[in-house]
Amino acid sequence: MKNKKRFVPWLIAAVIIAAFAVIGKKLYDLMFGGSLAVTTEDLKNGIIACSPAIIFIVVVLIAALIVVVAAGKLKQPKRALVRAQAPIAILLAITLSVNWVILGVEYSVVNSVFAEDVKVSDETMASGRAIADQIASEGIVLLKNDDKALPLSAGTKLNLFGWSSVRPLYGGTGSGDSDTSNAVSLIDGLKHAGFEVNEELVKFYENFRTERPVGTIRLREIGSKRGDFTVPEPTIAEYENANIFEDAVAYSDTAVVVVSRTGGEGFDIPQSITGPDEYNAQYGGLAQFYDFTTQAEDLDASKSYLELSNREIAMVDRVCKEFKNVIVVVNSSNAMELGWLDQYDSIKAAVLCGAPGELGFDSLGKILSGEVNPSGHLADTYVYDLLATPTVNNFGGFAYDNYAEVTGSQDNRAMFVNYCEGIYVGYKFYETAAAEGLIDYDKVVQYPFGYGLSYTTFDSSIAAVEDDGEKITLDVAVKNTGDTAGKYVAEIFYEPPYYNGGIEKAAANLVQYAKTEILQPGEAQTLKITFHYEDMASYDSNGIKSANGAYVLEAGDYKINLCSDSHTILDTYVAKVDKDVIYDDAHDGARSTDQVAATNQLTFAQGDVTYLSRADGFANYAEATAAPANHSLSAQALADYASAATFDAAKYDDPNAVMPTTGANNGLKLADLTGVAYDDPKWEQLLDELTVNDLFSLTADGGYHTVGVESIGLSATEDCDGPTGVHSNYNPAAGPSYPGSVMLACTWNQPLAKARGEQIAKECAEINCAGWYAPAMNIHRSAFGGRNFEYYSECGVLSGLTAAAEVSGATENGLICYVKHFAFNDQDNYRQNNICTWLNEQSAREIYLKAFEQPIKAGGMGVMTSMNAVGPVWAGGCKALLTNILRDEWGFHGAVITDAVVSPWYMDGNLAIRTGGTKMLAFNITNEFYRDLNSVGTVTAMRNAAHGTLYALANSFAVTRAVAVPKWVKTTYAVDAVVAIILVAWEICAICKYRKAKKEDEGTEQ
C-alpha cells in the first residue's frame, strides 16, 4: 500500500502538467492552425521570448532528477521527504513559467487568442449582404453583346463549359481571400435566376477534378504548400470519350464558357508557362515553390498565364464550332488577353465577373436574365498583347551583385525593379501613345479603361458649367433613350496642354466621375460634378518650372472631356489658364489641400534609370522600356541603403535631447483626449503617464492588436485583415465576404463605396476590432501583379476616390482603416527581399501616392507600410515618405503600422519608430527588439510613435470599451490558486508523513 501511495503525488503532478499541455495545445491550434498568420519568424521570436522560462523548467527538472537520485543514499523517512520536493518543485516551476509567459511576455497574443467569442449580428449580416449584392450587380462589366444576345430568356437551358464553371473563383488568396463556405456557386446563381443547367456536363467536370489549385503561397508561413498555377481543363479526347459535345448539342443550343484566373499574396502571375528549369534560370529559383502547370499540353513558353491555355483553346474552338450562341464569363480580377472573343462569330456576348465574393454569382444570374441591367465599367485597360506593354521588361525582380555589405549577409539577397514607364501607366500610356502616333490604338487596345456596355442606351452632354477659376462644376445631363431601366456613369477626363520636352503629361487623365440612379426609359437626371483646377496640376520633379520641384498648372487650354471611357469623348468644355500657377512658396503657395507646399522628397529613389518621355513622340521608348542592363548598386545607393546592418541611431537622434518624463500620475485617460487636437498640450501630459514598458509594448507588439494600458484607460484592441471583408484573426467571427476591390472599383459608384465602409465599421464594432488592415490601394502597374485582385485599379485617381469614399464611411463610424501598402508595393515577387523600387517623383506623386493621398486627406487615421524599398530605403523606415510627405505635406496624424515583420534583416523597428512609423506588425517581441531600449533616443522615438497610435485610438470606438480583467486571466488566477492549495497541501502532507515516520522510528529505537 505504501508503494502505491508513493505514486499519488506524481500522478497529481502528471494530471496538472497534462492540463497545461491541453491548454498549450489549444493555444497552438488557434495560433498555427487557425486564421492567425503566424510565420516561422514569429515562432523563432516566440521561442526566444520564452527561453528564460524554458531554461528555468529544464534546470529545475534536471535538479529534481538529481535530487531524486541523490536522495537514494538517504535513509527513510528523510529520503521520502526529499524526494517529495521534486514533483512539487517541478510543478511550481511549470506554474511560475506558464504565468510568466502568458501574463508577461506573451500576454497580448494570448489575450487576443482567448478573447471572448463574438459574432456579427444577423441584422448586420443581412445589411452587409445587401451591400455585397449591390456591389456585384454594379461591378459586373458587360464587354460584348452582339445581336442583343443578352439578356437570355427565362428558363433558357445552359451548357456550362470550362472546368471553372464548377469551381469558379470568389476572390484571391492571402490577406484578401474570401470565405467560400457559404458562397453561392456560379451554377446555383444561374439556377436562382431561373436557368436550367446541363447536369451531365457538371458531373463530367466534377469527376475530372474536385479542388482548385492555389497559385500562390505565403513564404515562411507554418504549413505553406507548394503553389500551382495549373488551369484545370480536360483534353478534347476526354470530352469526346464522354460524348460531351454531342449530348450538349442535344440538350440546348446555348453555351456558356467560363474562364477563371487566380491571383494572390506571395507571388506574381507567370509571364511564361515554362518548366522549372527555364524559370529558375531566368528568375533565380522561384519555381521551386510552385508549378506553372501540371498539364503537359499547356507547357508553352510563348504564353502567359493570362492567355487561354492550350487545352482551353481547344475547348473554346470546339464549343464555337458546335454552338452558334456562346456567352463567355471572364472570372478574373487580373486583366486577361481577350482577343479571342472577337475571333469567333459564335461568341455573341461576354461579361467580366472578377472576384464576386460569396453572393456575386447570384448577381451574375440576375444580369444574364435581365433582372439587373449591367452598369459596371472597367478599372483597367484590356490590351491584345500583355507581353508588349511598357512594363513587361521591368516587372518581377532583378538581383544585385554587390549587396552583402549593406544587407548583412550574402543570403539576404538585394533585388530591384525599375518603374521605367514613369507616369505612363495603363490608359495614360495608351491614350498618349495614340495621340503621338506611336501606336495604332485599335490594334493594341481591345477594351479601354472605363469601358462598359448596358442593355439600354443613354444620351449625355455637358449642359452647364460653373467656372470661377478655382473650381469647375459641370452639369452633366443624362437621359435613358432605350427601353430598359439602367444606370449611367459620367466619366470626366482632362487633356492638359503639353509642351514638347517639358513637364511630362498624359493625353487623358481621369479627374472625377459620378453615377446616376436607376433611370427608367425616357427618364433624365442631371449630375453635378465638381473638381478644382489644382487637381489638374502636374508634378514638376525635374525642376523645369520650380527649382526644388512643385505641382505646376501650366498656362494653356485644358480640355475637360465627358467620356464613356478613356478613349471615347462625348462632349468637351475648354478651361483656359492664362499663366503658370506654381504651387510652391516662391510663387503661388501650397495647394489648398496641402499643409505645406510639396517639394522633391524622393530624388534618392530615382536612381540611374532612363524614364519614358513623351518628348518627340516617345523617341526614347525602346531605350527606356528595355530590360535593365546594370545589376550593381551604385556608390550612392550603397551609402543610402537602409537595413539592420547599416542602422545608426546617431543619424536620427538629437544628441541634445533630454529623457522624456515617464510614469507620471497626471490623472488623464485616453477617452479625455477624444477630439483633442494632435498638438494640444494635453497629449504631452497623457504621454508622460506611460512607462518605458508601456511605450515598448505599444510600438513593438502590434500584430493584429494594440496592447492595453490600464493607467490611461486603454483596453486591448484587435485589428482584422483583408480588403474583402471583416475576418477576425483570433476567433471565427466574420462578416460577409464582399466582392473584391476591383469589382468595387468597377462600380464607379463613390456613395456605394462609402456605404461599404460604413458597413465594415459596423461589423468591426460588433466583433471588437478597432482596426482594419484595408483598403489596399496599390496600382495595377502590370496585369501580372499577384495581388491585383486586392487593389482597385491601374488609375491612381479611380483608386483614390474609391478609397476616400470607403475610408471616410468607416472612419466616421469609429474604425481605423490602415490603408495599405504604403507605398509602391505593386508586385509580390521578392517583396521580402527589400526589393529596391526605382521611380521618378512625378510618377510617385501622380500615380502611386495619389491613391493614398485622397483617403488620407478624407480623414484616414491609419496607414500600413510596405515590405519593399523606396529606392534603397525600406518603405517602413523612409522618413521622406512617412514624415515629410505623409505627415508634413498631407497633414496626417495617426497610426502607421508596418507590414508583417518577416524579414528583420531590413524591417528594423529601430528605424521605423524614428522615421514616422508607430508600431510593428509583429509577435513575440523581446526587449532586444530595440537597441538600447532605455536610451534617450529610443524612448523619445517610442513616445512619438505611441502618440500617433493613441491619437488614432482616441478617435475610434476603442475608447468606448471598458477596461476589465479578461475572463481567461481570472481563470488563470483561479487555476493558480488551486495549484497553490495543492502544493501547500502536498508539502504539509509530506512534512506530516515525515514527522510521523520519524516519531515511529524514534519509538522503535526506544
What are these language model-derived features?
Residues M1-G543, A547, Y551-N561, D565-S566, ...:
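Glycoside hydrolase catalytic-domain context in secreted enzymes
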